[in-house]
A protein has these predicted regions:
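Gly/Ser/Thr-rich loops at beta-strand to alpha-helix junctions
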Residues: 1, 38-43, 111-112
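Generic structural hydrophobic/aromatic packing signal, biased to beta-strands
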Residues: 6, 37, 60-62, 123, ...
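Active-site diphosphate/adenylate-binding microenvironment
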Residues: 18-87, 97
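Thiamine diphosphate
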Residues: 71-169
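Terminal amphipathic helices with adjacent charged low-complexity linkers/tails
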Residues: 1-20
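Generic hydrophobic alpha-helical segments
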Residues: 6, 10, 49, 90-91
Length: 169
């Protein structure tokens, strides 16, 4: 039952007048651009990459995840973003299309495990000169803290061996 149905039934049962409640005026909220959360480790990672590539002709290939928000000021560290797992392969294509550019790819740990590994395999196989930055916060943060192969916990909550990203790369 809805709140309104229960309210009307109670007023009728108690033989009370059931006046319609006054509408609540919702205040207009100020504009707030999307930003990385306070304390997010990706802020420092993006800043470090920005400092390290200063003066280079760099392209920053992003991916789908909360770190996509690295595209906004003051970081401005995501030039491309297409779909989950595309950042690594887009960096490869851009390196071939524009050899003078330094291409960095940013992928979260969850994206790395779910769709990034084939791109890494291709980059190694093709001997492509790209930099892959895996932003590892040990969870699937954007969609609710789900485990992934790097967490050591299965989707059913069972403990298992965590896969180590650095060892895999």
């Amino acid at each position: 039952f809805s709140y309104e149905t229960v309210r009307k039934a109670l007023f009728k049962y108690l033989d009370l007048e059931c006046a319609e409640p006054d509408a609540v005026k919702i205040p207009e909220l100020p504009f707030r651009p999307p930003v990385l959360c306070a304390g997010c480790p990706h802020r420092a990672s993006f800043y470090a990459a920005k400092v390290a590539t200063k003066g280079m002709n760099a392209v920053y290939c992003g991916d789908i995840g909360c770190y996509t928000l690295g595209n906004a000021a003051p970081l401005n560290m995501v030039d491309t973003c297409l779909c989950m797992g595309a950042g690594i392969t887009i960096a490869q294509g851009l390196t071939l299309a524009e050899p003078g550019k330094k291409c960095l790819s940013f992928a979260g740990d969850s994206t790395f495990f779910h769709t990034g590994i084939p791109g890494v395999i291709n980059a190694v196989y093709q001997n492509t000169d790209i930099t892959i930055v895996v932003l590892d916060n040990h969870t699937t943060a954007m969609t609710g803290q789900q485990p992934h192969p790097g967490t050591g916990v299965t989707a059913m909550g069972e403990k298992t061996k965590a896969l180590d990203i650095e060892t895999m790369l």
